[in-house]
Amino acid sequence: MTAASSPHPGVSAEDIEFYQANGYLRLPQEAHGLFDDLAKLQAWVAEISQWGLETGKWRHYYETTNGKHLLWGTEKLMEYHAPMRDLIAGEAPLTLLKSLTGKDMVVFKDEIGWKLPGGKGAVPHLDRPAYSMFAPEFIEIMIAVDAHTVENGCLQFVPGSHKEAVPISADGRIASAWLEGKEFIPMVLDPGDVLIFNESMAHRLDPNKTDQRRAAVFGTYHFDRSQPDLRDKFYAHRLIHSPPENAWVETVEAQT
């Protein structure tokens, strides 16, 4: 199986209206058409979960919680897994995103978030500050590999928060005063569902309190097609400033 290669039929006018109003869109597998076999997607992710700490290739990030050293994320996948490259950077996701936003896009970050049992949550935040030096505007596709539930720490959004000037405190978190009275809505997903959201969505995650993994594949896309090499610059910078567990020596030009 390969990722879907025929042009995406597009999203509905209602989908576009919902996305513009709320800042996110949830699509089931039969609607998004990014792949045709969930079992194959899960097999690809199973393969990647076995990748070791090799040098100069993919990048593993870990977290320590309750005395356990847990795989948190694996980035820079596409060079080493052709089906995953097609899934994230092929015609289907780019056509889907253009149908939703009217814009052409280029991928600049690719990863799997593992969210293993016991994995940590995240305080309310925006993704924009972390990447704004590279892309002031971007959009993310999250593909649920496993079920995403309240119990295992699914994403929670404040709908419509992308329209607000959300204040960010010095530590990078959303200012506590803004959070007063805000309702975070859980993004409960079935395996194979897709969640699309933009850089300015206020969101949080709870810890995974179950004995089951809650993995997802992420593609992050910017809108400036005059910078097709932005992904290379991003990962060169990230290697220097946020090195992975399998840190290695690469010939890179640090982007500071």
Curated annotation (Swiss-Prot):
The keyword Oxidoreductase belongs to this UniProt entry's keyword annotation: yes
GO molecular function annotations of the record: dioxygenase activity; metal ion binding
Assigned keywords, A-Z: Alkaloid metabolism, Dioxygenase, Iron, Metal-binding, Oxidoreductase
SUPFAM superfamilies assigned: Clavaminate synthase-like
Positions that bind Fe cation: H125, D127, H203
GO aspect biological process, one term: alkaloid metabolic process
Cofactor dependence: Fe cation
Pathway: Alkaloid biosynthesis
Enzyme Commission number(s) from the entry: 1.14.11.-
Induction of the gene: Expression is induced in loline alkaloid-producing cultures as well as in planta.
Family designation: Belongs to the PhyH family.
Free-text function comment from the UniProt entry: Dioxygenase; part of the gene cluster that mediates the biosynthesis of loline alkaloids, potent insecticidal agents composed of a pyrrolizidine ring system and an uncommon ether bridge linking carbons 2 and 7. Lolines are structurally differentiated by the various modifications of the L-amino group and include norloline, loline, N-methylloline, N-acetylloline, N-acetylnorloline, and N-formylloline.
Protein name (database record): Dioxygenase lolE1
Native source organism of the sequence: Epichloe uncinata (Endophyte fungus)
Name of the coding gene: lolE1
